[in-house]
Design a protein with these regions (language model features):
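Carbohydrate-active catalytic/glycan-binding domains of CAZyme proteins
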Residues: 1-318
Length: 318
């Protein structure tokens, strides 16, 4: 459960292992369809990797950690907080804050509090920091800090065609938060002819060159009707900052395209040079993701890219 991939250019990714590789970490007995693990988030702080997520089939929200991302992860540290889509934020003073969906005094929204990420112990009062920016189902929260501002980014509108991503900011981690005047920062809700739809549930990152990116979910429709057969996929889009707010893509309207021009990192590495092709329409070199799969079934052990539905039952192996 929860595969970990590594990349030098944000386009070509190699599977390196799994955060959850044993039943003591991941109990999936009697797991229903669309059950199990929801929305994992990975963070790194002072030599430690953290992965926080929800097992909706078991005991809810938990965090695991490791100093070596290519080795085993810890046993789960369970967190006494309901809701889904948890995330961690480490402030300048090393305090760690948890945020997820939740309910405080009957009000549903985004809940935050200080936490010990190694043990899951809650260290402060739980507070409702946002009810969203007007869309239904505010979820998938992430907190960032940039230039003295705390930014709270959340998904809204549900996970179908009204999906979108909004952002707010405050000088205090607990708010009050003011909404970006140009929200949503990404959405294809009003662009039904776009090949990409249902964009949202995003995370921001800054690369080694100081360039910003948005990684998010979306779907690719395959006909004039809003139909798709691959489900929600992972997308990447360039981000620039204007007037203290992130602007996604280059269209100025919160939409992206399947092919975009952006300064990717690591273009001089071997993984990049092996996957650069000339675009037939523009004649320009484009870095493509390599989706090819080559598995040798003569090996004694199964390839780590193969997964078993729910907890493995070795009695069914041949």
């Amino acid at each position: 459960g929860v595969p970990v991939y590594h990349s030098k250019n944000l386009v070509n990714w190699e599977l390196t292992g799994y955060c959850l590789d044993r039943r003591s970490q991941l109990e999936l007995e009697d797991c229903r369809n669309s059950g199990g693990i929801y929305a994992p988030t990975i963070r790194y702080h002072k030599g430690m990797f953290y992965m926080i997520t929800t097992n909706v089939t078991d005991k809810g929200n938990f965090v695991v950690h490791t100093e070596d991302i290519n080795s085993e992860w810890s046993e789960p540290a369970w967190i006494d907080q309901g809701g889904i889509d948890p995330s961690l934020f480490f402030d300048d003073d090393d305090k760690c804050y948890y945020c997820s969906t939740g309910i405080i005094d009957g009000v549903r929204g985004i809940v935050a509090f200080e936490i010990n990420p190694l043990t899951g112990v809650i260290l402060s009062e739980k507070k409702l920091i946002s009810e969203g920016c007007g869309g239904q189902c505010p979820e998938g929260p992430h907190i960032y800090k940039k230039d003295g501002w705390y930014y709270l980014m959340i998904a809204e509108g549900g996970t179908e065609y009204a999906h979108r991503e909004t952002i707010q900011r405050s000088y205090n981690v607990y708010g009050p938060y003011e909404a970006c005047p140009d929200n949503p920062v990404i959405s294809h809700k009003e662009y039904k002819k776009s090949e990409i739809q249902a964009t949202g549930h995003a995370d921001l990152l800054e690369d080694e060159n100081g360039n910003w990116w948005l990684v998010f979910l979306g779907i690719r429709r395959f006909s004039h009707a809003l139909l798709h057969n691959l489900g929600r996929e992972t997308f990447l889009a360039p981000v620039k900052w204007e007037n203290g707010w992130p602007v996604v893509g280059y269209n100025g309207n919160g939409t992206i395209e399947l092919v975009m021009d952006a300064p990717l990192p690591g273009l001089d590495c071997e993984e990049s040079s092996a996957n650069i092709r000339i675009d037939k329409q523009s004649g320009q070199p484009i870095l493509y993701a390599d989706h090819s799969v080559d598995i040798d079934f003569t090996d004694e052990l199964l390839d780590k890219r193969l997964q078993y539905t729910r907890n493995p039952d070795t009695s069914k192996y041949i």
